[in-house]
């Protein structure tokens, strides 16, 4: 007699409920949940995408060598730390910074800080160096440094003459003035912004003057072809310029956008073309080149421009994307634009970082992080401003060798230098005496509004701890 009920067989196994959540992530989208596509999270704080999985970011790391120098006031050899009062008085306050790549045989890369009366150089494996200014020269406000061949040029802004260092450790920093002026040339004027381009130094002076120096000589320019007036008489002010393609510069003014183009080495065919775009741009150091585009941050948010077409007589038309930051619009609305002049940007092989001030911050202590590999916003990063209150991004020093890899360093106005996305589990940005200044990293992830049938957004806070 057959049993009335057969045992449960493999074909009779009930189906398990299907998961409705995201199996992997591709970035951050802060719009309303119904607008967020699958694979995106509503918010990510201090997080990184690793093969579709969000993990806590690594921290700031200040190497011990970042506060070494070969001399302090009054120039005696020493091993310098934060507790050296003479060093702090003379060289802690920093007005600008960047990188000096020695073009000589050694090819060393140094982090450079601009202080009141000297340039301070630091790098791995060596005691740093201090290059003093010539007597009577000082820096007392925000400045920009650029390198053209072996020269470092310090742009002081306003009506102040720019400075330069010739690249030899025995030299001092001097004013950027010609020893003699060739016929048909003029001395370069004071500038608010500069860059090296096609063996020339390009300076933005006053409201309208785009000045291109002579080749190999940053002190003077051709008075006929080396200066062009950009949107003259319209009331807006020159802010920044970034190389675009092989023969053009994207010139950003406070309220207008232009393309300067010159194919001829002598600049005899130069032209300037105004682009049809509205903008309010007050953050010159956010203008950078990456992925064959120019990126910048203005009141509309992060925007990009690339060459759309080149017409007759080398007229350049741009393709402008003003929607880049639409997915992080809530963060853009929180930016403290009062401090826009302090904002900056940096590029690595994997990411683009925009340093800004949010909400009540008065210094750039927030990073908006764009992931170049997935072409999406990855996170916004902040650090503990209670424990690390004085650490903020004044300037970036990209591709600085440390522990056999190029690292992105940030330079703070208090003289601290730290590599980003390196130290595990905490931020370390310097020392008080011999005690490290540390702060834990808190990461928060908010989903796009539904997971496994739930209509509620979920927040997760976690700490990733690695024990060796």
What are these regions (language model features)?
Residues 1-153, 277-293, 299-468:
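Beta-sheet repeat architectures centered on beta-propellers
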Residues 115-117, 157-159, 198, 206-208, ...:
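Surface-exposed loop/turn positions within WD40 beta-propeller blades
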Residues 119-123, 249-276:
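Surface-exposed extracellular loop regions of Gram-negative outer-membrane beta-barrel proteins
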Residues 119-122, 162-163, 202, 250, ...:
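Conserved hydrophobic/aromatic positions in well-ordered beta-strands
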Residues 126-131, 168-172, 219-225, 265-272, ...:
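Beta-strand initiation motifs
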Residues 166-196:
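Asp-box/WD-like beta-propeller blade repeats and closely related beta-sheet repeat scaffolds
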Residues 189-217:
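Carboxylate/His-rich catalytic cores and anion/metal-binding grooves
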Residues 216-236, 258:
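Intrinsically disordered, low-complexity linker/loop segments enriched in Gly/Pro
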């Amino acid at each position: 007699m057959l049993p009335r009920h057969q045992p449960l067989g493999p074909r009779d196994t009930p189906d398990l409920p299907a998961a409705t959540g995201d199996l992997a992530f591709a970035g951050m989208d802060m719009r309303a949940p119904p607008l967020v596509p699958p694979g995106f999270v509503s918010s990510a704080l201090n997080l990184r995408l690793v093969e579709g999985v969000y993990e806590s970011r690594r921290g700031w790391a200040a190497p011990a060598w970042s506060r070494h120098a070969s001399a302090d006031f009054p120039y005696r050899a020493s091993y310098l730390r934060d507790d050296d009062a003479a060093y702090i008085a003379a060289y802690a306050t920093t007005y600008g910074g960047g990188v000096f790549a020695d073009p000589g045989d050694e090819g060393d890369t140094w982090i450079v800080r601009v202080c009141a009366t000297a340039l301070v150089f630091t790098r791995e494996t060596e005691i740093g160096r201090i290059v003093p200014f010539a007597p009577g020269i000082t820096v007392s406000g925000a400045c920009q440094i650029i390198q053209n061949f072996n020269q470092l040029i310090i742009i002081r802004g306003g009506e102040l003459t720019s400075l330069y260092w010739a690249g030899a450790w025995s030299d001092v920093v001097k004013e950027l003035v010609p020893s003699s002026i060739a016929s048909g040339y003029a001395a370069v004027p004071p500038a608010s912004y500069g860059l090296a381009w096609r063996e020339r130094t390009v300076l933005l002076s006053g409201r309208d003057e785009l000045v291109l120096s002579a080749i190999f000589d940053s002190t003077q320019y051709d008075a006929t072809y080396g200066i062009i007036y950009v949107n003259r008489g319209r009331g807006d002010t020159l802010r920044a310029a970034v190389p675009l393609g092989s023969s053009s510069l994207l010139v950003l003014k406070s309220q207008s956008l232009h393309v300067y183009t010159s194919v001829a080495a002598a600049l005899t065919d130069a032209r300037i073309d105004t682009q049809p775009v509205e903008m309010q741009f007050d953050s010159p150091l956010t203008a950078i080149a990456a992925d064959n585009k120019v990126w910048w941050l203005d009141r509309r948010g992060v925007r990009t421009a690339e060459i759309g077409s080149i017409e007759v007589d080398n007229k350049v038309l741009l393709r402008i994307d003003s929607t880049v930051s639409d997915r992080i619009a809530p963060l853009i609305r929180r930016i403290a634009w009062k401090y826009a002049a302090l904002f900056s940007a940096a590029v690595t092989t994997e990411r683009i970082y925009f340093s800004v001030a949010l909400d009540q911050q008065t210094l750039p202590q927030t990073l908006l992080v764009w992931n170049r590999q997935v072409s999406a916003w990855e996170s916004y990063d902040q650090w503990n401003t209670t424990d690390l209150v004085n650490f903020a991004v004044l300037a970036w020093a990209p591709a600085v060798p440390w522990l056999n890899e190029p690292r992105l360093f940030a330079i703070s106005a208090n003289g601290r230098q730290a590599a980003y996305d390196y130290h595990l589990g905490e931020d370390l940005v310097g020392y008080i005496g011999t005690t490290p200044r540390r702060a834990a990293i808190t990461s928060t992830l908010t989903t796009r509004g539904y997971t496994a049938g739930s209509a509620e957004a979920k927040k997760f806070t976690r700490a990733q701890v690695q024990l060796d």
